[in-house]
Amino acid sequence: MNNTITRLRGLYDRFFTLISYLQSPFLLFVRLYWGWQLIQSGWGKLHHLGNVTEFFTSLNLPMPAQTALAISCLEFFGGIALAIGLFSRLTAFVLTINMIMAYVTADREALFSIFSDPDKFYAAAPYTFLIASIIILLFGPGKFAVDTLLERWFGPSTPPISH
């Protein structure tokens, strides 16, 4: 009995050791895919600022022209930073706040149906960007990122937190 448990534990450990090798490629995929999507979204907004300003005006956002420019730049440059893995967690934090605000201002009905009609929440435009941002915020950019190179060259920016 004890030998079986030891063998199962060994198989379990080896399986999750192998799976852990997929973490950085997965994070790279998340950063590249959603970074590219943000770049395209920001680029489109930058080239149609009048339409974005008009939309933000219809939402009664303060300073709609300045907000449109700021959000467009955030999505474009934030998408670039996310894709290459530069200042990843800071970028992901700002993008997370941006996507939450997109829900609050532009997709309020979807936000309030998170429990009553989750499909509406999942189908809203900010959802995948929000999830991608949260993934990078919580898990970092992975090994294949500019942040990782900077950390190797200059050392960690803050001491690691013990769990």
Model-inferred region functions:
Residues 1-43, 47, 65-73, 77-163:
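Extended, low-polarity transmembrane helix blocks
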Residues 49-62, 89:
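Short juxtamembrane and helix-loop transition motifs at transmembrane-helix boundaries
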